[in-house]
Amino acid sequence: MLNRYLDISTEVKEALEQGKPVVALESTIISHGMPYPQNVETAMNVEKLIRENGAVPATIAIIKGRLKAGLTAEEIDYLGRAGHAVPKASRRDLPVLVAKGSDGACTVTTTMMIAHMAGIQVFATGGIGGVHRGAETTMDISADLEELGQTPVMVVCAGAKSILDLGLTLEYLETKGVPVIGYGTNELPAFYTRKSGFGVDYELDTPEELAAAFHAERELGMKNGMLVTNPIPEKYSMDHKVIDKAIEQALAEAKAQGIHGKETTPFLLAKVKDFTGGDSLESNIQLVYNNAVLGAKTACALAALKG
C-alpha cells in the first residue's frame, strides 16, 4: 500500500533489480545540517564517493508529497536552497506531509523507513539521534532509536551526537535488541570525537565482517536494524574537552531560550559550530564522507554475499 507513494529513481531501481549495491542517504543533513552551499556540495560529494567505491547512492527525501528514493542534482539543490523552510520529517509527520503534498527532509528514522520500503539495506549518515540529557524528566528520546529497533536496515554513522546522553542511548538500544558495532574500535565514537568512554557490543574490522553479521541478522528473521559506529578520521577528530565545553554552553542557551523537541538538535549543532569557530562543521563534513565510503564498501560486500 505504501508503495503507491514511493518513487524510486531509474538508476536505483535498476541497481536493486540487478542485485547491485545501493546506499541510502538522508536529507536533513542537506536542509538542516549545514548552511548553503556547503550542504549541496557535501551531498554531491557523498554521492560521488559512493559511486567511486562501487555502489549506487540513493538520497531520500519527500518532495511534493512523494517519497523519493534517489534524488536528481536539481532536487538536492532545491532542498539545499530551501534549507530550514523544509520541515524535518520523522515517522509521525509522514502521513500529513504525503496527504498535503508537502516537502520533507528525512531524518534517520524516515530514511530507514523509506529505504526499507524500497529494498535498500545499507544507510550511511553522520550521527544518530538518541536519549537527550535530562530525558528522565523531559522524555526527549529520538525516534531514531525506535526505528533501529523495528526496521531491518544497517545504519553506518560516527556514533550518537555528543550533545546526547550516550550511556542512556546505549541502554535504550540494548532494550530494543539493536547490536552496536564498533568499526575497528571497541569504544563508542561520539560524532566529533573518536572516544566517548563507553564500550560497544562488538568490534568488527572489515566491511566483509559487517556484511556477514547483517546478513546473519536477516537470515535469523530478526526485524531490528544494526548500528555500525565508525570513528571520525583522526585528522579531523576534535578535542573532547573543547567539544564538551561547547556543548555545555549550547545546552545552557537552549534551556534559557526554551528550545525543545525537534528544534533541539539543529539549535545545539549550530551553537557548537559557533563556539568552535566553524571547526565542527569541517569535522561534520569529513565524518560523513568517511561513513559514505564504509557504507559503500559494506553494501558491495553484502551484494557479493547474497550474489
Pin down the residues of each PLM region:
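Glycine-rich nucleotide/cofactor/substrate-binding loop typically near the N-terminus or early
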Residues: 27, 32-34, 40-96, 219-235, ...
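Anionic-ligand binding region
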Residues: 194-219
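General beta-strand structural signal in soluble alpha/beta enzymes
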Residues: 23-25, 58-62, 104, 122-127, ...
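Solvent-exposed alpha-helices and their adjacent loops that cap or buttress functional pockets
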Residues: 14-17, 22-23, 52, 114-117, ...
